[in-house]
Amino acid sequence: MTRADARENRARILEVAREALAEDGTTSMNQIAQRAGVGPGTLYRNFPTREALALAVYRLEIDQLTGSVPGLLAALPPREALRRWTTDLVSAMRRKHGLGDALSPAGHQSATDQSYGPVITAITRLLDAGKHDGTIRPDADPRDFLQLTGALWRAATGPEDRSQPMLTLILDGLSTHPGKAR
């Protein structure tokens, strides 16, 4: 197998695991290998445990999320970029919560510890852009923002999902002109 094939297998395993574990946190490693079209040996060579696989899925998600900030800021006004990014953050946190069956308490803590710095850096960039254009209050703190958004991913999903109205309240609280640029 070439290195390119190995990279493709790893990427396919991660994508399948991301979907499978989000659907059902109890999905077995063998089921993931089957869905990814790889043998169990390939799966276990890349990810020796379910927890290692779940942590890799989460790391990939955080990398994609934090890596999206420059593109959002290039395409959108800062407040709208912050809204879109935060909506994606909420989805990622809900999926992380869905990994509960695959992660031990130590695994959850490891995921949180590894993601905190990059997430705070991303929030800082988004808030700083809004501060620079005058739409975000100068005293907005990325750590406070992250704490506030914790309630969003815990909000009910489905028809009772209140995360978007709650996000509007948070953004209005950060705004130099509440109620504008929704």
Regions found by a protein language model. Give the residues of each.
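Basic, helix-initiating cap at the start of DNA-binding domains
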Residues: 1-35, 52
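C-terminal peripheral helix-coil segments that are non-catalytic and often amphipathic
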Residues: 117, 121, 125-136, 151, ...
